[in-house]
Amino acid sequence: MKLPVRLPVFFGIAPLGLLLGLADPRVSPPVRPSLNVHLPKLAFGSSGMLRVVTANPDERLNLPVSVEGVGPGEVLYRWLPLYGTRSVLPITEFPLASGIMAPSEPGIWRLRLRAGSIREEIKDLTVVVRVPFAAKQGGEINGYRIGRYGTEGRIRFDAYSPPMGFIEVTPGNEDMQLSEHLRLRQFVTKNQREIWPKYVALDLRLIDKLELVMQELNAMGIPARRMAVMSGFRTPDYNGPGEGGRATLSRHTYGDAADVWVDNDGNGYMDDLNGDGRVDANDAAVMRIAADRVEARYPELIGGNGVYASTPEHGPFIHIDVRGKRSRW
């Protein structure tokens, strides 16, 4: 008698998956080849916490990127737009050996390298290309009021020459990290809330210094996990002339000053940094000690430092800037 042919019956997900032509989950996927890219420490600031580099259009970047095991002439780079940055430029690759030039268009960009068929995006660092100062016409850029700088139209090369340009801020990029603990939206002028895009002058040395102050506080045994920014960049239009015209030279209008406090619990007020059970100007004075220590260690970040007491409108805070010379009040 001829016995019937019995087909094997498979039980379990894996064998059935193989019958259906699906990948076996027990087998690891192939490893994607990557480039061993090295970024210089200077790209992340003295704090090691910066996450962006700012540049003017077509500016040569001081960013000596190297790729281990690959000759410089074998690596090409191109720019990828981020956060809704619009580009009309053709997709072009450039030789890394010739140095890295910033994109020709303002916006937020990421660097991508390619060696043969292997591609690698540099995700640790974002390049922000400023809108040139010359784009400001009649005190505005795209309907956003900036105003006029007191030194505008004069030939100056000091800390009071107008900023080189402005970062364009949109609803899509305002939450971008500038550093480990600070975001772009924290430094936007507090008026014209309904107008987009907005524009911010920003000196990354300030961001680096604020991160270093947080590090110093932690080294002093004072927890500093979160920094609130009451005021960062202020447009000249918003800041006004002040008494006797003094505010026309405010460091806030140049993008290298901020009024800040440590706010670990996120309640909107300075924390009790000195542990005396009160929140007052003495806590801001603790931050001054940390800022003084940072300046002693990093003289290139020297600047102003002012302690402010509480008012009915706000709690105590400290002003920190990187104007290039020591000033205290």
What are these regions (language model features)?
Residues 209-244:
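Extended, low-complexity, intrinsically disordered C-terminal regulatory tails
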Residues 163-223:
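Active-site acidic/histidine clusters and adjacent loop/turn architecture
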Residues 118, 218-223, 299-300:
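Secondary-structure boundary elements
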Residues 25-137:
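Beta-strand-enriched, solvent-exposed domains that form extended recognition/catalytic surfaces
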